[in-house]
């Protein structure tokens, strides 16, 4: 059974490698990630995960396709992926001393979309306050890490972990963009051995 990761994310590729080694392919989907009118962050992450997997599954009906998407939500607003370093600086500064909720959607699709498993991991991340996170620290982080195209501009797999006071999650890998614990459960339901 072919296994395909529907993503262009290097971090998701690295995470999937942890449980599948080289037994998967990568095919990045092209979808519109714009939120629908009044769409909440949980539904957005679930919808985008499913759309990514379905897009790739249409042309790869013999494969199990993995789609995942992450949405950050802080103080009443969805934090879109930063397009430039200035946006990233503003996003990190916005989260100082606050709680950000990360919704990491996961979808597995096979048979061209006839069979689907999907779900969302909700993680709460508590950022350190301004006594710890200075403007200079944020600027240095943005310059060194270049956190573009990641939810909330916080690369928790890298230097972004320095901003964090505490995390509440059932799946630590979800915070990096691909919930491996849930993925292993989904694969098992379809009798797919991840590290075969």
Segments (PLM) and residue ranges:
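N-terminal beta1-alpha1 ligand-phosphate binding loop
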Residues: 1-21
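Anionic-ligand binding patches
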Residues: 3, 40-196
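Cofactor-binding loop segments of dinucleotide-utilizing enzymes, especially the Rossmann-like FAD-
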Residues: 8, 29, 111
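Glycine-rich, flexible loop segments associated with nucleotide phosphate handling
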Residues: 9, 25, 136-138
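Flexible, glycine-rich phosphate/dinucleotide-binding loops
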Residues: 12, 33-35, 115
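Short loop/helix-cap segments at secondary-structure boundaries that form the rim of catalytic
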Residues: 15-18, 36, 58-59
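Glycine-centered loop/turn motif at secondary-structure junctions
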Residues: 20-23, 191
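A short beta-strand-loop structural module common to alpha/beta enzyme folds
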Residues: 24-35
């Amino acid at each position: 059974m072919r296994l395909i990761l529907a993503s262009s994310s290097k971090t998701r590729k690295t995470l999937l490698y942890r449980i599948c080694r080289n037994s998967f392919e990568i095919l990045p989907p092209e979808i519109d990630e714009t939120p629908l009118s009044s769409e909440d962050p949980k539904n957005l992450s679930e919808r985008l995960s499913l759309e990514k997997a379905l897009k790739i599954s249409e042309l790869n009906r013999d494969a199990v396709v993995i789609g995942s998407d992450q949405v950050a939500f802080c103080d009443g607003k969805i934090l879109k992926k930063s397009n430039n370093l200035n946006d990233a600086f503003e996003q990190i500064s916005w989260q100082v001393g606050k709680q950000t909720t990360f919704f990491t959607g996961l979808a597995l699709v096979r048979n061209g979309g006839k069979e689907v498993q999907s779900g969302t991991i909700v993680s709460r991340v508590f950022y350190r306050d301004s006594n710890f996170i200075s403007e200079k620290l944020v600027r240095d982080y943005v310059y060194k890490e270049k956190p573009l195209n990641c939810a909330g501009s916080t690369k928790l797999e890298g230097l972004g972990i320095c901003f964090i006071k505490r995390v509440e999650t059932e799946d630590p890998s979800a915070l990096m963009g691909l919930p491996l614990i849930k993925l292993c459960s989904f694969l098992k339901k379809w009798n797919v051995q991840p590290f075969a």
